[in-house]
Amino acid sequence: MSSSRMPALFLGHGSPMNVLEDNVYTRAWRHLGETLPRPKAIVVVSAHWFTRGTGVTAMEAPKTIHDFGGFPQALYDTHYPAPGSPELAQQLVDLLAPVPVTLDKEAWGFDHGSWGVLIKMYPDADIPMVQLSIDSTKPAAWHLEMGRKLATLRDEGIMLVASGNVVHNLRTARWHGENTPYPWASAFNAYVKANLTWQGPVEKHPLVNYLEHEGGSLSNPTPEHFLPLLYVLGAWDGQEPVTIPIDGIEMGSLSMLSVQVG
């Protein structure tokens, strides 16, 4: 990564409780914020904004969305008042053309997939942000190609942060007691790590075809938490380092794996 080029990050966000807790994952997020070059703006792709078509937040002051239930009141009392950037939102509309991108001026904001990690990285909430939705109607290869389009922003001081979990099966999660990963979750997590720097035709990429892995569908019964990774892999230039700043599996079937490009 050149001194002026921003990294691209995929962060495994896990439980909303990470907002309130001090643990190995939140400390790693804080360390990233303290050691990476400070961006002039951030584009976030979160698993929690899964839409038909593509949208981007385009308001001056996006709201903090508490898109979860059954947690302590302190979590609902927490807000992340980072400024929006209508100018950056319009830049994304132009950059991603001919893909139609809707400017969202009131409906969405920053959901816990975005603010839940960035509140640890940049607790002062003073970096302009926009959030880009994930089009639920498109195949995996399309999302990797979107990452390629977004890569040019990295040379303009803009950081790409994608947030999800490469293993995300809440039906099998061990909510209490034993925290041992399921063998299939560990195997799929290892498969992801082994293929981060694969190069070849997009349609043949092992992580575009992640459901072909024997643990793919069990690790991801729905695609929205896996797809954000593909945006970051698409932003890789094929030569810069790809590292794993954070790894681990919580509750048996929730991967906290994070990936840094650049």
Where do the protein language model's features map onto the residues?
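Short glycine-enriched loops at secondary-structure junctions
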Residues: 47-51, 62, 109-118, 166
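Beta-strand elements within well-structured catalytic alpha/beta cores of enzymes
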Residues: 7-11, 41-46, 132, 153-166, ...
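Surface-exposed, charge/polar-rich loops and edge strands
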Residues: 94, 98, 127-128, 136-138, ...
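Internal, conserved structured core segments that host functional sites
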Residues: 89-144, 149
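A short aromatic-anchored loop/beta-hairpin motif
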Residues: 2-103
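Solvent-exposed alpha-helices and their adjacent loops that cap or buttress functional pockets
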Residues: 2-3, 35-36, 121-125, 152
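Flexible, glycine/proline-enriched loop segments at strand-loop-helix junctions
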Residues: 75-83, 105, 133-140, 216
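Short, basic/glycine-rich phosphate-binding loops at helix/coil junctions
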Residues: 9-10, 67-72, 122-130, 207-208
